[in-house]
Swiss-Prot record:
Family in the record: Belongs to the metallo-beta-lactamase superfamily. Glyoxalase II family.
InterPro entries documented for this protein: LACTB2-like_MBL-fold, LACTB2_WH, Metallo-B-lactamas, RibonucZ/Hydroxyglut_hydro, Sec-metab_biosynth-thioest, WH-like_DNA-bd_sf
CDD domains: LACTB2-like_MBL-fold
Name of the protein described by the UniProt record: Beta-lactamase-like protein 2 homolog
SUPFAM superfamilies found in the cross-reference section: Metallo-hydrolase/oxidoreductase (SSF56281)
């Protein structure tokens, strides 16, 4: 793993926001999952719950609650991945003494248990003293992804849509790019990400994410325009021509996701099971490039 910015296990980031690290570092979780306790009073909102059975995390969460003489009133989940929902049972058993409290989450087609969550939609709000959260649908990383707008600070909890460092993975690139633009348009003062350090240069970070994805998209479009029809594997071989075979195999899924997005944009057809054809027009990536060239 490349060198990562140090993230404190427990850190008070503002009057209303305390970050508790999930104690689960790894290639995909970076320093670990960031969970957050929100509020200035005795009632707190917990954003995400870390992985299951991580004793160090539960101990850290207990210590913050004890030191602030507070308790968890609500839990809000950004998305279904195990490093964000996995700690729910441990928290329920070891901190809430099996008391059931609202756990808010967006519903997805393949969900983990209907009775566990209170399913809510885009625009839902939950509040405690000093912290009013508006839930904003930002699909792409996953279909059920919420980002959370903290009204008092004009700050955003981005879940895994944007990370404190590095880039994230996604299920649907078309939806993901739309969500990135939605986040940019919010003009947040800062971003509290699901992994990594706090982001204060918000527009710069979001633009970096958008350009990273559009650069690869433009490379794929160039290859498509050079062929009548072409398979996703052949696109991958040309775009990643200088990469080892193992890297190309790993990149194939990302290429397929870009092709899926271009089909949604209406500039590519999928006439046969594994072949794709450029039919013309401008993709979102090309439009953005043209805007930049006119500045």
């Amino acid at each position: 793993m490349p060198s990562l910015t140090h993230v404190e296990p427990i850190e008070k980031l503002s009057d209303a926001v305390t970050r508790i690290l999930g104690h689960n570092p790894g290639p995909f979780t970076l320093q670990g999952t960031n969970t957050y306790l929100l509020g200035t009073g005795a009632k707190k909102i917990l954003v995400d719950t870390g992985e299951p059975n991580v004793t160090e995390y539960i101990s850290a969460l207990k210590s913050v609650l004890a030191s602030t003489n507070s308790h968890i009133e609500y839990i809000v989940i950004t998305h279904w991945h195990g490093d964000h929902v996995g700690g729910i049972d441990n928290i329920t058993d070891e901190i809430l003494d099996k008391k059931k409290i609202p756990i808010y989450k967006m519903k997805r087609d393949k969900d983990e248990g209907v009775e566990r969550f209170h399913y809510v939609d885009d625009g839902f709000e939950v509040a405690v003293d000093g912290a009013t959260l508006k839930l904003i649908a930002t699909p792409g990383h996953t279909a059920d992804h919420f980002s959370l707008w903290l009204q008092e600070e004009r700050a955003l909890f981005s879940g895994d849509c944007i990370l404190g460092e590095g880039t994230t993975v996604f299920e649907d690139l078309h939806d993901y790019m739309t969500s990135l633009q939605k986040i940019k348009d919010l003009n947040a003062t800062r971003i509290y990400p699901g992994h990594g350090p706090v982001i204060d240069k918000v527009v710069e970070k979001v633009d970096e994410y958008i350009e990273h994805r559009m650069k690869r998209e433009r490379e794929i479009i160039k290859v498509l325009k050079e062929h009548e029809e072409i398979t996703s594997m052949d696109v991958t071989n040309q775009v990643y021509a200088d990469s080892p075979w193992a890297v190309r195999l790993a990149a194939l899924n990302n290429v397929k996701l870009v092709l899926k997005k271009l089909c949604k944009d209406g500039v590519v057809e999928n006439p046969h099971f594994e072949t794709f054809k450029w039919i013309g027009g401008s993709s979102s990536g090309e439009e953005k490039k043209n805007e930049s060239s006119n500045l």
